[in-house]
Amino acid sequence: MQINLLNDFIKAYENTYSVSFDDSFKGRIQELCKELNEPFMHASYALENELKELVFSLDKNVNIAIIGQFSSGKSSLLNLILGRDCLPTGVVPVTFKPTFLRYAKEYFLRVEFEDGSDIITNIEKLAFYTDQRNEVKQAKSLHIFAPIPLLEKITLVDTPGLNANENDTLTTLDELKNIHGAIWLSLIDNAGKKSEEDAIKANLELLGENSICVLNQKDKLSAEELDNVLNYAKSVFLKYFNELIAISCKEAKDEQSYEKSNFQSLLDFLTQLDTTVLKEKFVKRKILNLCEILEDENQLFVGIFDRLLNQFQSYEKHLLLAYENFLKEIEILNHQILEQLKSISERISSEIFASVKEKDAYFYKESKGFLKKDLYTRYDYKAPYISSDDAFLAMFYNSDVMSKEFKKIKNELYKSFEEIKMKLKDFINILEREILLFKAEFSNIQKDHIFQSDKNFSELRAFCNASDEYFLKDFKELLFKSILELDLFFEKLNLKAFTNYENATKLSLAFFSRKINESRVLYELDSSEFVLFYPKKSEIYERVLNELNVYEFETLLINKPILTKIAKNFLEQSQNLIQEKNKFLDLKKAELQKRRAQILNVRESIKED
């Protein structure tokens, strides 16, 4: 069952994506369109339709647009081509929707409405649907069908005047995107004027490679004036068009002045157009334009990922530059902590040493000799002693000087640890600020062209929205772990040393008090063999060092410094995380590189064709 499902999936995939085409121009275009529509390209629905339309366009008529300023005579020109007055003429803007002139055996009109409906009606109804003064159902486009041989291979597109109104202008520009060539119609009075040239430049990319500039109303000029105007107009306009001619629609209406009108030159130009070449150039131009749009998208994504890579590069550089000083500060702190522990030990040992006193003591010993049997001799001596309770009370309760000093040292140490933690946080805050700025800038990014990939942009938005999850979470976990290790070490230091000084003092006092008492017992047993124990200051100091665990902390601070280890581990782990993030971003860029290679392959193939 599962094998059958898998085989069905593979077969469906091959039917969709493993299609082969012949070696004709159309077949090669189909192959290139398929490459742009590969699954990993994530083509938008609009792009898929555009690619299909490009292939279909090779079997359709070429579209030649009639473009010109309002009242330049476009309707009159098209009426001459149609052989009858179909399009209304006059001073009122009437051609408010694009109008297509197509071939049919009879004259009729098809009106396509904005709601998707359409009607077919008599050609005489055209004026009703084109007059802006009429309140009619919103039309999307008008299609005039006429039995004109020229229209068998060519569809003429009448566009609204460029300066009729803002909406007409926008519509005109939109319609120009789907034409193979254009007739730029201009009044001969405007020939060579800057305003006219500016309008041409604004639409230059949309004119195609087979366009003609037609100057209307040549009947207004004398032969000499016409030559001068043509020479000047050609010097200005011919760089934009294949050909430039002057006609007179007025003269072309009259059979007797038709030849003089030069209208036939325009018809000859249209008739002699190589429609196959036009279609091929059009498709090539459109595919190159699509490649440019997709490449722009690709470069945008590369730039976004490069920004993250640069941020991590800058962050790592900052870490390395700052960490040398940071480690030096920690090394200094290690020695400071050790010196503070020794200072506390020195202070306690001095107080204990000062509390060692002497007192009068005596003991009895059985007298020797026959006559002294059962008699005892008293021996007086000076005995060392420590009143542990009195000494302890004197140090910590009768006076709070030492307690205040130790508390001050502890607070200073706490601040030092907090400063270390703050510096670690500052490192992460630098990265966090950059990542959050990145998220804010790109989390709602939208495509700026309909042919760009919806899926790619959707995934990019999701990626940017989750950038803190992708790029901050691990660093924050590392920070949390490092701070926890610092807190644990501080707590250990605090419990075993800085809050243990009273207990260490008690233990030290008890130790020396016991040793003194033991020495007295031995001394009283045999004063010739044993001596009284008077603790030296160095002995007391060593004992306090042990009770305060100073030697243990000396190992943890100097020989195998825990703080330095935590700091170095933070740096090493940060660098490892940066490498991981860079690899992750490189994988993202590898996907983009694969798409870019596909785009470049299509671009090079279309240029070679």
From Swiss-Prot:
Chain intervals for the UniProt region annotation (G3 motif): 158-161
Main location as per UniProt: cytoplasm
Subcellular location: Cytoplasm, Cytosol
Catalysed reaction, written as an equation: GTP + H2O = GDP + phosphate + H(+)
Pfam families per record: Dynamin_N
Region described as Inserts into assembly domain of DLP1, required for tetramerization: 1-16
GO MF annotations in UniProt: hydrolase activity
Knockout-associated phenotype: Double dlp1-dlp2 deletions have no obvious cell division defects, have no flagella (possibly due to loss of expression of flgP) and are non-motile.
UniProt-annotated stretches for the region Linker: 17-25
Region of interest: G2 motif: 93-95
Positions of transmembrane segments: none
Region annotation (G4 motif) ranges: 216-219
Residues involved in GDP binding: S72, G73, K74, S75, S76
GO terms under cellular component: cytosol
Domain Dynamin-type G: start-end pairs: 63-310
Region (G1 motif): 68-75
InterPro entries with a match to the protein in the record: Dynamin, Dynamin_N, P-loop_NTPase, TRAFAC_Dynamin-like_GTPase
Alphabetical UniProt keywords: Cytoplasm, Hydrolase
Free-text note on domains in this protein's UniProt record: The 9 residue linker permits DLP1 (tethered to DLP2) considerable flexibility; it is long enough to allow the GTPase domains (dynamin-type G) of DLP1 and DLP2 to heterodimerize. Two regions within the tip of the trunk are required for homodimerization; deletion of residues 348-401 and 509-542 prevents DLP2 dimerization, but not formation of a DLP1-DLP2 dimer.
Recorded family membership: Belongs to the TRAFAC class dynamin-like GTPase superfamily. Dynamin/Fzo/YdjA family.
Subunit text: Forms a 2:2 heterotetramer with DLP1. DLP2 forms a central back-to-back dimer flanked on each side by a DLP1 subunit. In the crystal structures the 2 DLP1 subunits are in very different conformations.
Role, per record: The heterotetrameric DLP1(2)-DLP2(2) complex tethers liposomes and may mediate their fusion. Initial binding is probably mediated by DLP1, while DLP2 couples DLP1 subunits and increases the effective reach of the complex up to 45 nm. The role of the nucleotide is unknown. This subunit alone very weakly binds to liposomes; GTP, GDP, GMPPCP and GMPPNP do not change heterotetramer binding. Tetramerization is required for GTPase activity, suggesting the GTPase domains (dynamin-type G) from DLP1 and DLP2 must dimerize to reconstitute the GTPase active site.
Protein name: Dynamin-like protein 2
Lineage of producing organism: Bacteria, Pseudomonadati, Campylobacterota, Epsilonproteobacteria, Campylobacterales
Name of the gene: dlp2
